[in-house]
Structure formats: C-alpha cells, structure tokens
Amino acid sequence: MKPEDLSALLSAVLTDAVDAGDLPAALREGITPARVKVERPRSREHGDWATNVALQLGKKAGMAPRDLAGLVAERLTGKPGIAAVDVAGPGFLNVTLDAASAGALAREIVEAGPEYGRNDTLAGHTVNMEFVSANPTGPLHIGHTRWAALGDAIARLLRASGADVTAEYYVNDAGNQMNVFADSVLARLHGRDVPAGGYPGAYVQELADAVALEHPDVRELTDEAARPVVREAAYRLQMQDIKDTLAAFDVHFDVFTSEQTLHDSGAIDQAVQRLREQGHIEDREGAVWLKTTDFGDDKDRVLIRANGEPTYFAADAAYYLHKRDRGFEEKVYLLGADHHGYVNRLKAIAAAAGDDPATNIEILIGQLISVNGAKLSKRAGNIIELKDLVEWLGRDALRYDLARYPADSPLTIDPELLRSATNDNPVYYVQYAHARASGAARTAQAHGVDRSEFDAALLTHATESELLAQLAEFPAVVAAAARLREPHRVTRHLEVIAGAYHSWYAACRIVPMPTDDGTPRPVETLNRTRLWLNDATAQVLANGLGLLGVSAPEKM
C-alpha cells in the first residue's frame, strides 16, 4: 500500500462518516484524497504512516480533534491492509499496515517496471520548456551546463507526470552579435586579429579553418563578398557543435527556433499589430511602446525604435505569441542569473496577450555555478566549456550534482568529491546501491534463488518496512518534483532509498546462509520474496536516475 492508497482509504472512511450523518456535510470538500495527507512518522514506534487530518478538520466538524481522530480510527480499524490505528497527542492518527499490505508493493513495482513512478497528475497540460538557448557564437560553457541538466530533468519529470512537453531551444541568431561573430571568423581566415569587441579564443580559428575547407575560394573574395558566406557557414558549424555537445550530455531538444525567422517571416510586425489591436501599444517619441506598466512592469518597453528597427524585446513578444499560437498552455523559461530584469517584462507580454501570468508563464531564474580547480579553456576564450567538464568529471556525476540543488541556489562543484568512489559522493552512493542490487540478483540466480514465489507477509524485518515505505513514496516525490519544477527532490529521495537498501542488505539475506560445515541450506519462500524486494529497489533506483539523465550501472 502506497501513501496515496492510504490517503484514498482515509478519504473513503471520512466520506462514509459524512454519508452516515456522523460528520457534517460541510466537510465533504475537504476530505478528497488529495487533501488527506499522510507522511512517514519520525519514529518507527509510531507506525508506518501518520496523518493530522483530524486536527485540520476538527473545527469545521464541530468536534475536538482527538474525538474526530477516534471516530476515524474506529472506522479505519479492520479495513484490508490495516494492522493498527492509534490516536496520539491532540489528534494525530498513527497507522500501521499489515506486512502483507506493505510488502505487496515489491511485486507491484517489479511488474510495473519502468512505469513505476510515472503518474497522470499533469495529464492534459501542454508545456513549452525553453532552456539553454545559448548564443550561437561560441561553445557552451559552465553556466549552460547547469541549465542543460536542470531543464532536461524538469522536462523528463513533466513527461513522467503526464504532461505533453516540448523541449525548446531559442537560437539568438539575429542582431549585430552575428555580424561581430562573422567578422571575427573572417579576420582569422586572413590571419588578422579579431576586431575590437570580437570573439577571442582558438575555436574561432577552428571555425575559420572549417569554413575554408567548405569554401576553398573564400579567401579570394573581398570582405564584403565573403561576409555572408562566412556568417552562414560559421553559424551552422557552431550550432552543430552546440547540438553535438548537448547530445553527448544526453540533453535533447524537440525544437530549435531561430530568432531570425521571426524577423524574416513578419512575425514581429504581426505581434506588434496584434498588441496594438488589443489596446496595449502607444506611439510616442517616434517609437512604438508596449505599455507594460499596465501589467506591473517598472516602465514601458520599446518594441520598435524611432529608426524603425525592432528591439530584442519585440522579438521576445513575437516569440511568446509564437509559442501561444502553437497551443502551449504553459510556457516555462529557465534563465540565467543575469535575467532577473526579464521576469516582469515577460509576464507583462503574457498579460498583454490575454494570458494569466500566474498560470500561463513561469520563469525560473538559476544562480551562478563555479568549479573548484577548473581550468579555463583557452580554446573558448578563458571560459570553462561544457564538453571539458563532462570529460573531466563524467556525465553522470555532473548531471546528478547539478540536479541535486534548487536552481535558485548558488552552486560550487567539488571535483574531488565527484570523482571519488566513496559513500560521501552522492551519485556514487546511489549508483552503487543499484549496482549492488543488480549484483545481488546475479548471486541469487547463481544459487538457485528466483522469483517463482512471493509472500508479502514474510517481509516483517524493520529494515524491510523502512525500505518499502521509501519505495512507496517515490511516485509522490516524482509528482511533486514535476509540479514544483524541482529535480533535487528526486535526487534526495534516491539517496534515502539507497541508504534504506544498504541497511536492509546488511541485515537480511537473499541467499540462505550455509550451515557451519558449508552445506547449502534449501531456498525458502522468504528468500524468493526478498529477491522481489531487491529487484524492486533496483527498478526504482533505475527509474529515478533515468529521470535525471543519469545511468544505472549494473556493475561498479
């Protein structure tokens, strides 16, 4: 029995009491399964699960919470799967499951396989998840590494919770930066220094060499004639490098949207016209302004300059409407720490478009990241490249560590820790638990222990109860992590599961202990049932790691 199953049972008991007239009808709205919360008590002596539902409903029921708890306990006692119900303190309910009910979860998990933990709490939600969106003028760096790991993990969690998700990369390929980029590559083609304000780094020379291979005669052209050729080729080659780097990091996008296409297709002019028709545009000082102060921004924003050129903000507005027109109910932006000023203006765009800024747009601002002892990349112009971090620390360690902390907390990566094969290294600790469970299954098979029998009532050891309880909470953790956009909830829970597994592994044998003279003892139902629990744990660990883009090794 999982916590959500117990919540549903408690809800049914309370509903029956209302129907019988023992509780007032006014309680009905507050006793849905979603509102009846259960949690693991701090002390095992207080049962398997606890709830404060009587404390929450006592006043509305016109009863002392302890009396209400007693009524619920009386009705809950004797229900299938319930071993004991105790009232504690001012009205807490402590529930102990019978071993068969708790242990049945092991078989349920094994039979569900990769589907265990997936849920439908966000079914019907259409989500556009935009992240990374680095300029195509250089390699991905350390900051992009964090947004890639977090954004991809959030997208995986949303999908696991039933949402229809599109992972999107917005390519900032318009504006003067692309001209500066092209001029930098062009300068290197001719052996010149990059222009003032240009892009340094050996990667620019590499791009120049690659462009020359594609276009052998490019050096014979004038700069004016060569510039569009160089710009197109260097942009395409750099974007391919970005895509290859992301793929090596196991981060995948469904859509790459070009900012330039918004200009070329007339989408920006159309967006301005739509906003004008809705009454949110003002012409003054020769420019076109969006009245964002009407929606909480600190000042109005220019869309079209007096010289007729659209601003970057105009592209932002057109891009938001582009997402909206594609049917996305929720637009999630994962932006860097230098984008705090974008929050109000993006929400103003949403409001001006007729959306609810509280529900239709979500802006996650990530904080800075640093790495102790990292070497700056001369190739990239004294930055730390994503591909170098992956090569140095390993994809799994890096992705896990980046997902382990809230996006809005500054993070310093400890390479020595992440490269260590010790229990102090969180990713090693979790992956080792999976490898240990996989190894235990191989050992069991070699000794004739299989899953041909299962008796959940035999899983009575205290470590088995704890392990089952943590496995039972996994689906709710996944749902909460998706709803709150917080992958770190999954990492922390996996560490709890790993700890519970290691304790169980030390206390309970799957393969029977031989006699003192080495004679093998016969395999019993308990041994086979424990193999189910072992394999269930391996499955949950693999499922959780997969949601983070981290592998689940079978050997370490």
From Swiss-Prot:
Keywords linked to the UniProt accession: Aminoacyl-tRNA synthetase, ATP-binding, Cytoplasm, Ligase, Nucleotide-binding, Protein biosynthesis
GO biological process, one term: arginyl-tRNA aminoacylation
Gene Ontology cellular component list: cytoplasm
Domain of life: Bacteria
Motif 'HIGH' region: where in chain: 134-144
GO function terms (MF aspect): arginine-tRNA ligase activity; ATP binding
Coiled-coil ranges (or none): none
Signal peptide extent: none
SUPFAM superfamilies linked: Anticodon-binding domain of a subclass of class I aminoacyl-tRNA synthetases, Arginyl-tRNA synthetase (ArgRS), N-terminal 'additional' domain, Nucleotidylyl transferase
Subcellular location: Cytoplasm
EC number, UniProt record: 6.1.1.19
Swiss-Prot/TrEMBL catalytic activity: tRNA(Arg) + L-arginine + ATP = L-arginyl-tRNA(Arg) + AMP + diphosphate
NCBIfam families: argS
Subunit composition and interactions: Monomer.
Family: Belongs to the class-I aminoacyl-tRNA synthetase family.
The protein's name: Arginine--tRNA ligase
Organism from which the protein derives: Micrococcus luteus (strain ATCC 4698 / DSM 20030 / JCM 1464 / CCM 169 / CCUG 5858 / IAM 1056 / NBRC 3333 / NCIMB 9278 / NCTC 2665 / VKM Ac-2230) (Micrococcus lysodeikticus)
